[in-house]
């Protein structure tokens, strides 16, 4: 098996599309899609995805390195694994996305958009993940880690978002995120069209979207900054004990509301460079627009993913409250 990332960036296929290593078999399922199945019995089926936004390169490089050490025999695979490089079309152009945000296309969201390379890719990703889980052992617990980096700075640099779900959240997933030294966990309060919502909703996978720092071009990442999550991912796929957390207790937030841009004249009371987890207190105005201002009713809230430049009708930010 040649370099997973290089093949994907070049739009090429490996010389052979399947093969066997010392302790697992593998299949190239298509561009940026690699399935690995241990020869021994396994009790977890794990999806690791990166590059759903094409310019978020550090997680892509982490998955590429993971693939390298697995194929070199330096790490023993103990779970059934699907490696996903989400949006090769945007990766090659160094863009977050080319036409529309792929991470808002899942759960059939692509059907409501014009047919583009990216909408077709979302459909392929849904079908590939569905087949992967359906062909895995019926006894295997299902997991999905979707790795991202952010387009803005953050007062809490690394965090995970859990999709809204009615079934209980998985303790092993939470433990792995704590062990990865993430700063915060954020629980969504409504259904969405993200990749992790798709896997959670349709396959009851324990799913999380991880935000792991700042987006930089390929080759400019200091991967030592991602050592904790890299170690945890390797321990998850090799079924080794998780490392001990080195940071203070992880902070926990709940999404309490979404800021929806309803009018063209929409202004947020944040600077363009304001970091994630910027705060507002009771009575302060977060956003103004003719159809009505957003005034804080709680004692304190935090803002995540503020973006006043979204299209009308879309979410311009998340409003969070902290769970004590």
UniProtKB/Swiss-Prot annotation:
Pathway: Amino-acid degradation; L-arginine degradation via AST pathway; L-glutamate and succinate from L-arginine: step 5/5. Binds 1 zinc ion per subunit. It comes from the Bacteria. Zn(2+) binds at residues 53, 56, 148. The keyword Lipoprotein does not apply. GO terms for biological process: arginine catabolic process to glutamate; arginine catabolic process to succinate. This is Succinylglutamate desuccinylase. It comes from Acinetobacter baumannii (strain ACICU). The lineage of its organism: Bacteria, Pseudomonadati, Pseudomonadota, Gammaproteobacteria, Moraxellales.
